[in-house]
């Protein structure tokens, strides 16, 4: 069964009303008693009742005017039966037991799910929650090894009420739960300037999405609304709101609870007393003086590709065919997370990612006049520090596993230390400033490249943890004649 659905079902089991929260969700053909005609009739009745104009919402987003979008909506709705309006949603009530424990075999987590009045402040809360810069909740939890990742989702919404789910990947739920409370208290002390800063970050996050993802956020997620208002009161209400806590822990399963078509090893969560000190929270923006650092005198060689009007974008990557493996690359990304998030607060953007089989760091620097020397220097110093490899998540598709291994298997030259650096956009002055920052890297920058060696040949067999098998054939085409010959063979 789908593990995220099992966990969501465990949370919904804590709702005593309406009864729909515990109704049948999944099952096998045997559970339907084999009566296919009755199933088809029930599905038809459901469709005729609910797939009608008065019970549906249509969301449109596009470059057209509101009038044009309205005409498109009217044209779509013309083919729908009007139907009956839905009855008012019954109030959501939680049951007697709201602290639950679910036995799991892997991926322990904490779900903290408060019932709150709908508010635009939820999107602002999400921006604070997803922040990874030094002083944030997630940076502190990772530093103490209390949690790995976080997500915020809606479990339910009606016209006035919302049921949120704050989901933390953690095997220490008591400590994380306590720090969430401390964090909500700290958020109540944020200033209007700080709240506006995070609101603007939420708008940047939204604008970076594709049009389809923007539409999804408007309909089901956390699209930015009005500027912050009453955020401290919202956080206080959130802290005091009725909520469900679910600790997903790797413990021996006890008796199972049948709910929503699942059989869940669900029990009461008996919290252990914890007295860990609160994390030291800090919120942004930083004072301008905190971004200034002494500029090195020496300069490293830097390839500059001018592009008039474009902001400076720095690309750093290991020499060709010398990229770290996936385990080391993932660990480097974890190491860089706080400083890349700090760069985002300063008006820039950074990403450590895999591109065509090689790990690379892309830094979009802020507008001219806003040079975060301290942040950039901290990022560059991180590149010289060793990292402990992380176990990469298993690839569920065999051919993707082979494709991911291909660049490393094709490499023939020995490992070469150093970094390749290039700057796209920006002015000559920007290039000079960045070249001086790059001199902080202890390894060679843009070292001479050895002559490329021919690609490996032959057949190589790789062990795949799954049960599938796959064959990948790679044929390098060094010139146009080879490509033409291959096309003739095809």
What annotation goes with each model-predicted range?
Residues 66-71, 172-178, 254-258, 324-327, ...:
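Short, conserved charged micro-motifs
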Residues 48-54, 156-162, 308-311, 352-358, ...:
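Short, flexible turn/loop "capping" segments at secondary-structure junctions
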Residues 32-33, 57-60, 126, 165-171, ...:
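Second-shell loop/turn segments in exported
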């Amino acid at each position: 069964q789908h593990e995220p659905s099992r966990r969501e079902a465990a949370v919904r089991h804590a709702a005593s009303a309406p009864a729909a929260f515990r109704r049948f969700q999944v099952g096998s053909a045997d559970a339907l008693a084999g009566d296919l005609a009755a199933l088809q009739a029930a599905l038809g009745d459901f469709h005729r009742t609910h797939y009608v104009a008065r019970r549906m919402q249509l969301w449109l987003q596009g470059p057209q005017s509101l009038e044009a979008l309205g005409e498109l909506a009217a044209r779509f709705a013309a083919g729908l039966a009007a139907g009956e309006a839905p009855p008012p949603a019954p109030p959501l009530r939680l049951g007697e037991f709201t602290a639950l424990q679910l036995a799991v075999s892997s991926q322990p987590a904490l779900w903290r799910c408060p019932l709150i009045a709908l508010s635009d402040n939820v999107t602002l809360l999400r921006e604070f929650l997803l922040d990874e810069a030094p002083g944030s909740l997630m940076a502190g939890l990772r530093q103490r090894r209390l949690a790995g990742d976080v997500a915020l989702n809606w479990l339910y919404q009606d016209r006035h009420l919302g049921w949120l789910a704050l989901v933390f990947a953690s095997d220490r739920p008591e400590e994380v739960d306590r720090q969430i409370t401390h964090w909500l208290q700290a958020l109540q002390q944020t200033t209007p300037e700080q709240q506006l800063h995070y609101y603007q970050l939420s708008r940047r996050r939204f604008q970076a999405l594709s049009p389809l993802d923007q539409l999804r956020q408007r309909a089901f997620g956390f699209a930015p609304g009005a500027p912050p208002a009453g955020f401290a009161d919202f956080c206080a209400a959130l802290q005091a709101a009725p909520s469900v806590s679910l600790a997903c822990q790797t413990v021996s399963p006890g008796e199972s609870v049948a709910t929503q078509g699942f059989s869940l090893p669900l029990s009461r969560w008996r919290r252990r007393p914890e007295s860990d000190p609160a994390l030291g929270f800090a919120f942004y923006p930083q004072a301008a003086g905190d971004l200034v650092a002494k500029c090195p005198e020496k300069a490293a060689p830097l390839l500059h590709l001018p592009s008039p009007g474009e902001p400076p974008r720095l690309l750093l990557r290991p020499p060709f065919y010398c990229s770290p493996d996936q385990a080391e690359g993932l660990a480097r990304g974890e190491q860089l997370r706080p400083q890349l998030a700090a760069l985002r607060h300063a008006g820039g953007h950074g990403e450590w990612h895999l591109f065509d089989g090689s790990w690379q760091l892309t830094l979009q620097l802020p507008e001219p006049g806003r040079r975060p020397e301290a942040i950039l220097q901290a990022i560059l110093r991180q590149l010289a520090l060793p990292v402990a490899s992380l176990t990469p998540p298993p690839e569920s598709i065999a051919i993707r596993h082979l494709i991911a291994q291909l660049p490393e298997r094709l490499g023939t030259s020995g490992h070469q230390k150093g970094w390749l650096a290039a700057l796209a956009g920006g002015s000559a002055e920007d290039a000079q400033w960045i070249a001086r920052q790059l001199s902080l890297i202890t390894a060679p920058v843009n070292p001479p490249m050895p002559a490329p060696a021919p690609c490996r040949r032959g057949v190589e067999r790789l062990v795949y943890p799954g049960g599938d098998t796959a064959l990948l054939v790679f044929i390098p085409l060094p010139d146009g004649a080879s490509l033409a010959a291959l096309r003739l063979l095809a």
